[in-house]
């Protein structure tokens, strides 16, 4: 990530998990590969302002070093998601799941496996397909999988964010362990054929200029194969991949909050009198 812009001292960034209080509805927020809960925090704050309980999970191996990310797999990431889901389930309110990039794929797996326990799903620039050159590269180097925890792929320029100020302060590793990249491709390949099993209401938000997870390939596949009878696509015009912190983050937060708010539990008469 290039931090050589004007400000030599970017502000301190909180990359830790967060739980924001609310009532009547809980939301599980899942960040992407090499990311941190920070990239879901603005969205979480806006949802909490609407009195939605929000839990931003930290996926296993993240918020640490590239070496730490190379020691885990998609099974560990999904375990982090399930732990977060169980934490919210204890409150007894309806739960929605919201995932960015790889987090969108993990959200889809949770929706498939939890069924009616989830009220709705939101996928933000989900990583079901990488660009063709990246897919071909990973396929070509797959025979080196035994060395995957010692091989790193460089992300030139850091995170794919259009807004320069947001890109400058965005935390995250710009070295991607080959093992983690292969785990993402395996996760996506396992979840894609099961999208038809998702029947919860679904919202998909994706940027047309996304170069990490191409808009046409991903949105066409998801909208065609998602089993939900109610599904909606929102296309962003200015942002790149990390849409929760990019130029249109306010619109993303507004669209998500409006969509999930209708799943809030209706207070009973006795509860309303308390």
Regions found by a protein language model. Name each.
Residues 15, 177-194, 200:
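Active-site nucleophile elbow and catalytic-triad environment of alpha/beta-hydrolase enzymes
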Residues 34-44:
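The serine-hydrolase catalytic nucleophile loop
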Residues 47-66:
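Conserved alpha/beta-hydrolase
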Residues 99-103, 107:
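Gly/Ala-rich beta-loop-alpha elbow adjacent to hydrolase catalytic centers
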Residues 122-133:
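Active-site nucleophile loop of the alpha/beta-hydrolase fold
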Residues 198, 204-206, 210:
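Short beta-strand/loop motif that positions the catalytic acidic residue
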Residues 211-218:
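Conserved alpha/beta-hydrolase "acid-adjacent" motif
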Residues 234-274:
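Catalytic active-site module of serine/aspartate enzymes centered on a nucleophile-bearing elbow/loop
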């Amino acid at each position: 990530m290039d931090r050589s812009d004007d400000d030599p001292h970017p502000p301190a960034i909180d990359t830790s998990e967060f739980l924001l209080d609310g009532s009547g509805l809980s939301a599980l927020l899942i960040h992407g590969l090499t990311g941190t809960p920070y990239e879901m925090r603005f969205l979480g704050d806006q949802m909490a302002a609407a009195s939605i309980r929000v839990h931003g999970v930290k996926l296993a191996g993240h918020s640490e070093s590239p070496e730490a990310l190379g020691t885990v797999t998609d099974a560990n990431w999904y375990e982090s998601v399930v732990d977060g889901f169980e934490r919210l389930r204890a409150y007894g309110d309806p739960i929605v799941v919201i995932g960015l990039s790889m987090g969108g794929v993990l959200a889809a797996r949770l929706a498939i496996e939890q069924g009616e326990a989830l009220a709705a799903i939101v996928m933000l620039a989900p990583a079901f397909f990488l660009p063709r050159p990246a897919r071909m590269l990973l396929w070509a180097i797959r025979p080196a999988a035994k060395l995957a925890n010692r091989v790193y792929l460089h992300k030139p320029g850091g995170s794919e964010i259009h807004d320069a100020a947001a890109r400058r302060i965005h935390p995250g590793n710009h070295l991607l362990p080959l093992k983690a990249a292969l785990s993402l491709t395996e996760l996506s390949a396992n979840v894609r054929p099961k999208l038809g099993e998702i029947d919860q209401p679904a919202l998909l938000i994706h940027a047309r200029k996304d170069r990490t997870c191409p808009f046409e390939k991903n949105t066409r596949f998801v909208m065609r194969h998602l089993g939900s009878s109610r599904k909606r696509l929102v296309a962003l015009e200015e942002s790149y991949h990390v849409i929760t912190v990019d130029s249109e983050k306010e619109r993303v937060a507004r669209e998500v909050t409006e969509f999930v708010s209708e799943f809030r539990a209706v207070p009973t008469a006795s509860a309303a009198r308390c």
